Amino acid sequence: MNLNIYKEIHFIDETIFPLNAWYSDMGSLVNKIYSHFHDEMEIIYFKEGGVIYEIDEIPHKVDEESILFFLSVVYHRATLFNFEKHTNYIFVFNLSIINSSVYDFCSNKYISPIINNEVNFPFSINSNNSYFEELKNSLLKIYDLNSHIVKLIATFLPNELQMV
């Protein structure tokens, strides 16, 4: 079976900051996210609504006020429920932004195992976790900062190249 047909390709402009971040209110448009995987890590903060994610064919119910983590090359799909009010923030980035090309103890011990998918990373964190609010607020700050950077750069582009 050719799994590359499920590969989702993301364009990440690494000249600015190697991260894509966007807000989604897709519940009013679609209630399924079809099977795919990608080379980048993905973090999704579900603000409203719920979803059943199938990760490597195993279903996981995720309610609002949850944060999901997908390491690179993890096969996943989803079905939304409560989709009349489904909103989320999505962050996709290449794990190379946290990796150093110079060997050091911290990279070798902590970062490399994440990049090489050798760590059992938590799949989701919900509002019952003590660190949920701090992580959620950090993600929202990253989203705001990314939006401001994109808008700032767009002001220097000719009108025909602006996408914002």
Language-model-derived ranges and their functions:
Residues 1-67, 73-74, 108, 119-122:
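Generic protein-terminus/edge-of-domain signal
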Residues 2-20, 75, 79-143:
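A hydrophobic/aromatic-rich effector-binding and dimerization subdomain
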Residues 140-150, 161-164:
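Basic, amphipathic alpha-helical hairpins
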